[in-house]
Amino acid sequence: MTRYKAQISYDGSAFSGFQRQPNCRTVQEEIERTLKRLNSGNDVIIHGAGRTDAGVHAYGQVIHFDLPQARDVEKLRFGLDTQCPDDIDIVKVEQVSDDFHCRYDKHIKTYEFLVDIGRPKNPMMRNYATHYPYPVIIELMKEAIKDLVGTHDFTGFTASGTSVENKVRTIFDAKIQFEASKNLLIFTFTGNGFLYKQVRNMVGTLLKIGNGRMPISQIKTILQAKNRDLAGPTAAGNGLYLKEIIYEDEECFSNFRK
């Protein structure tokens, strides 16, 4: 068997998430269906580095899969890309070692979250940015987001009832940009891993701080108390993008560890 690693992007609007689910359209199901056609009708299982939820998008999701023979990687990429549905793009395919695992090999993820703060909202962005109809002071959020950087127990920012025991993660970079011409806030988080709904909960909290309904110090309070009830609401998934995944063997990996 030959193992392949692929970078994929997708518009999550019409998917019930990445991972295969019964009676639901998923990214995994669509790619596996295409690979089966390319593999003479034999099943191929793919593994994903991140399990994005319903409505969540990706520019840089990474998958791996095995095929019974070596293939030209560009021909394989082209075949997959042209036969997958239009809302999935196969960006790159490469052959990797048999022990490579896209989820368990050490890596760094970057997520982006787009928030439309236009009044009125932009209906063309309804599937691609979460609308926030209340006024915000961006400088308050820029000050508060600094407290998320570092190694912390993010219990207060994960979904209640999660089964993950170790909730310590490291965020290497967190920032907010504002595209005035589009009324878009762009939140960017880079870290060694993120808990279930962590990014969406952090954004929901920062927006509440920006609106003045929580103090700038609330981030520190939540981290210290490890209490989800102290955080803001979970922002909707349509604004979330898995932007990039960098593995330990890639040159730029060390830049984030400094």
UniProtKB/Swiss-Prot annotation:
Tell me a Gene Ontology molecular-function term this record carries. Answer: RNA binding
E.C. number(s) listed in UniProt = 5.4.99.12
Gene3D superfamilies per the UniProt record, alphabetical: Pseudouridine synthase I, catalytic domain, C-terminal subdomain (3.30.70.660), Pseudouridine synthase I, catalytic domain, N-terminal subdomain (3.30.70.580)
- Keywords of this protein's UniProt record, alphabetized? Isomerase, tRNA processing
Its top-level enzyme class, in one word, is isomerase
Q: Name one GO biological process term.
A: tRNA pseudouridine synthesis
Cysteine-cysteine disulfides: none
Query: Pfam families this protein is in?
Result: PseudoU_synth_1
Catalytic residues of the enzyme:
53
Which residues of this UniProt protein bind substrate?
Answer: 111
Catalyses which reaction? uridine(38/39/40) in tRNA = pseudouridine(38/39/40) in tRNA
Name the HAMAP family for this protein. TruA (MF_00171)
**Assembly and interaction partners:** Homodimer.
| Family according to the record | Belongs to the tRNA pseudouridine synthase TruA family.
Please give the function described in this protein's UniProt entry: Formation of pseudouridine at positions 38, 39 and 40 in the anticodon stem and loop of transfer RNAs.
Record's protein name? tRNA pseudouridine synthase A
Name the species this protein comes from: Streptococcus agalactiae serotype Ia (strain ATCC 27591 / A909 / CDC SS700)
- What is the organism lineage in this UniProt record? Bacteria, Bacillati, Bacillota, Bacilli, Lactobacillales
What gene does the UniProt entry assign to this protein?
Answer: truA
